Amino acid sequence: MAQAVEEWYRQMPIITRSYLTAAVVTTVGCTLEIISPYHLYLNPKLVVQHYEIWRLVTNFLYFRKMDLDFLFHMFFLARYCKLLEENSFRGRTADFFYMLLFGATVLTSIVLIGGMIPYISETFARILFLSNSLTFMMVYVWSKHNPFIHMSFLGLFTFTAAYLPWVLLGFSILVGSSTWVDLLGMIAGHVYYFLEDVYPRMTGRRPLKTPSFIKALFADDNVVVAQPPNAGIGAGARFGAMGLDPQAQ
């Protein structure tokens, strides 16, 4: 069993493995009280006035307390992050890293700007960690790249992956969870998808070209891979307990 887990971990692509490791180490550290979540959460005042710049990164690494929900989130993160890196971004590790960096920047900007707008500032002030939103962004982008994969929810109904973000949003509403986390992820995902996939087809220009200094960090082969019709099979569950599974077409 341990050998199988080790092999599974070693076979992960570099960005997925690094992000998953950082998230697990951070959350375990907080659980063991080695690190305090109060030193990790997003606080604009502390970032600007006290130069606690690390908060811009650490708020994407903490997934709250260690419990069954945490394990589901780690599975969810590992699955969709890996699917994107191995399929849509195969041979383009630098581009995938830039996607995550862009998404994190958009999410942080939304929270900072929203915190300055009357009537909704209190709502944004309660958003301390954006880790789940970044994961939801990955799901949104994956669903846009694989819109025709058939999925089922609890065996009650089937739908195509294009509607996966909306199904997950509906589930959050159903169980009484805050929808802001999901909505922010959808917004960031759509902004990226539009600028990276839609806008270039409309104008022939690509505004999100990965900077050369980021490309220099990764030894990528310039490979463009067409999406197979069953890309992502076995990748559909937000949480295994939800019964949200893809079906072969």
UniProtKB/Swiss-Prot annotation:
InterPro entries the record matches: DER1, Rhomboid-like_sf
Keywords assigned by UniProt, alphabetized: Endoplasmic reticulum, Membrane, Stress response, Transmembrane, Transmembrane helix
Cytoplasmic side: 1-21, 118-122, 174-249
Principal subcellular localisation of the protein: endoplasmic reticulum
GO molecular function (one): signal recognition particle binding
Compartment list: Endoplasmic reticulum membrane
Stimuli inducing this protein: By endoplasmic reticulum stress.
Single Gene Ontology BP annotation: endoplasmic reticulum unfolded protein response
Positions of transmembrane segments: 22-42, 97-117, 123-143, 153-173
A Pfam family per the record: DER1
Tissue: Expressed in roots, stalks, leaves, embryo and endosperm.
One annotated Gene Ontology cellular component of this protein: endoplasmic reticulum membrane
Membrane topology: Multi-pass membrane protein
SUPFAM superfamilies, per database record: Rhomboid-like (SSF144091)
Record topological domains on the Lumenal side: 43-96, 144-152
Function as written in the Swiss-Prot or TrEMBL entry: May be involved in the degradation process of specific misfolded endoplasmic reticulum (ER) luminal proteins.
Anything else known: Associated with ER-derived protein bodies in endosperm.
Similarity field: Belongs to the derlin family.
PANTHER family membership: DER1-LIKE PROTEIN, DERLIN
Protein name: Derlin-2.1
Organism for this UniProt entry: Zea mays (Maize)
Gene: DER2.1
